[in-house]
Amino acid sequence: MARVCQVTGKAPMVGNKVSHANNRTKRRFLPNLQYRRFWVESENRFLRLRVSNAGLRLIDKNGIDAVLADLRARGEV
């Protein structure tokens, strides 16, 4: 499975690791993804999502029902 947040769409990005001597090597910055279960009251069931920390904050702000409606409109869930 891809390392992509199901709510925000955050994915790994590429950058440079910079040492003290200013040597640069390529590296990947991974999003902070967690599997979380959310209780959806309207469907009377749990929904398991792979979300980033920013996605969790978005769910706290807007509510799981609003986020779920947006995901269904995009065709992701």
UniProtKB/Swiss-Prot annotation:
| Single GO BP term | translation
Q: Which UniProt keywords apply?
A: Ribonucleoprotein, Ribosomal protein
Entry GO CC: cytosolic large ribosomal subunit
Q: Name one GO molecular function term.
A: structural constituent of ribosome
Q: Which domain of life is it from?
A: Bacteria
Membership in a protein family? Belongs to the bacterial ribosomal protein bL28 family.
Q: What is the name of the protein in this document?
A: Large ribosomal subunit protein bL28
Which organism's genome codes for this protein?
Dechloromonas aromatica (strain RCB)
Gene assigned in the entry: rpmB
